[in-house]
Amino acid sequence: MACPPAPNRAHTPGAIDPGAAPYDGSVSATHIYEVLVEWTGSGGSGTTSYRSYSRDHEIRSAGKQVIAGSSDAAFLGDPDRWNPEELLVAALSQCHMLWYLHLAASAGIVVISYKDLPVGTMTELPDGAGQFTEVLLRPSVTVTEQVACARATTLHDDAERLCFIARSVNFPVRHEPVTTVGAKDST
């Protein structure tokens, strides 16, 4: 059973939540994230020409699986590897999902399924520079109770406001959630 759709909302970079206390500049914690990005595409000849080298690289962090990266195929990359644009869209989706699940659990809403098909839009300028113009998150969430539908849908607004990654980008991050009601898996 589908819940009523939520109005389309967007996080606007630099927007201030009118219901939030004014930001006083204080920080409660600082977190440091360190990764190694290593180019593996020299092929022995290095960057002797634009087409002479592979864009392949590896992304590593202690104790984690290696991520095989490249540029987008449109920029001579390997389409079988993750590109930075996909990783940015995935990071926005992951951050939103993790905040959403936290908020749902805190609100007593039982989520039994969460899937997202996010889409990022990037424009490229004649000189080769470019930027993202927006990311659209399209989460499909299943909750166990019909009475939780409205609140489950509005939690996306809170998740968007709290997501560290969405708060850090300079383009709109919109979300168009779909919430349905389903039964818990009894296995």
Residue ranges and their predicted role:
Residues N8-H11, D17:
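Intrinsic-disorder-associated, low-complexity terminal segments enriched in Asp/Asn/His/Tyr and depleted
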Residues I16-A90, L98-T187:
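Extended beta-strand/beta-hairpin segments
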